[in-house]
């Protein structure tokens, strides 16, 4: 039966090879069988520009290109850790870049896709930070810096982010329910798929269904499968 996959929040890095191994297994065995593959952000733990080169980055790009070459339509939506992924990455992998909110039609279902961080409006400090770093002039300035400097800046931002999370309540870091409902209504859908919060779940709400993709962990890959009958669910080992 025809089907498609949705994943997010892998946070791939050289320090967690077990996550890379899970991704390799998925991309070599499951992904090539799909019609579409949607990666909804935070594929990498951080991204400092398309000009960065490493064995891990090349391996990931090669895997996406391999799946794309099998005829699978691959899509990438920016996360809060890898929002600087650009056109060079897209060309090298065959993955189409999507905007912050993307409306798709899949198996006769209208679906709204987003990474999920834009729905967490109660975290005002993060939203202010997000608005700053998404300014195009600031991104251009950052990308002009030497790679070594960008790495230092990215590591400091990541450390600060991890520190801040310890002081924030779980409620603040989750989606705002009212705002999320407004977005769903704005796009005229009854199905929303997002990641970011790392709280894998399928929320059957009164007027719409909200599917939250989970983060990938040492022994678990959060993979949502949707088939042509319209059925969906997370793949369980």
Curated annotation (Swiss-Prot):
> Does the record carry Metal-binding as a key word?
yes
Q: What protein family is recorded?
A: Belongs to the LpxH family.
Q: Which domain of life is it from?
A: Bacteria
Q: Which organism is it from?
A: Haemophilus influenzae (strain ATCC 51907 / DSM 11121 / KW20 / Rd)
The residues that hold Mn(2+) 2 are 42, 80, 115, 196
As recorded in UniProt, its EC number(s) are 3.6.1.54
Question: Where is Mn(2+) 1 bound in this sequence?
Answer: 9, 11, 42, 198
Q: What is this protein called?
A: UDP-2,3-diacylglucosamine hydrolase
Gene that specifies this protein: lpxH
């Amino acid at each position: 039966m025809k089907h498609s996959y949705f994943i997010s929040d892998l946070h791939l890095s050289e320090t967690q090879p077990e996550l890379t191994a899970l991704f390799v297994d998925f991309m070599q065995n499951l992904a090539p069988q799909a019609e579409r593959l949607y990666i909804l952000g935070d594929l990498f733990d951080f991204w400092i520009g398309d000009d960065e080169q490493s064995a891990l980055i090349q391996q990931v790009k090669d895997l996406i290109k391999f799946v794309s070459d099998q005829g699978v339509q691959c899509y990438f939506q920016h996360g809060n850790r890898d929002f600087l992924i650009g056109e060079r990455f897209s060309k090298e992998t065959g993955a189409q870049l999507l905007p912050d909110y993307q409306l798709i039609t899949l198996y006769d279902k209208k679906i709204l896709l987003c990474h999920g961080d834009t729905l967490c409006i109660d975290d005002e400090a993060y939203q202010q930070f997000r608005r700053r770093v998404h300014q195009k002039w600031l991104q251009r300035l950052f990308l002009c810096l030497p790679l070594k400097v960008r790495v230092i800046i990215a590591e400091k931002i990541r450390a600060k982010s991890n520190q801040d999370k310890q002081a924030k309540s779980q409620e603040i870091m989750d989606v705002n329910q009212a705002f999320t409902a407004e977005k769903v209504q704005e796009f005229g859908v009854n199905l929303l798929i997002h990641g970011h919060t790392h709280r894998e779940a399928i929320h059957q709400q009164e007027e719409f269904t909200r599917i939250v993709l989970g983060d990938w962990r040492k022994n678990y890959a959060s993979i949502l499968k949707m088939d042509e009958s319209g059925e969906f669910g997370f793949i369980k080992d």
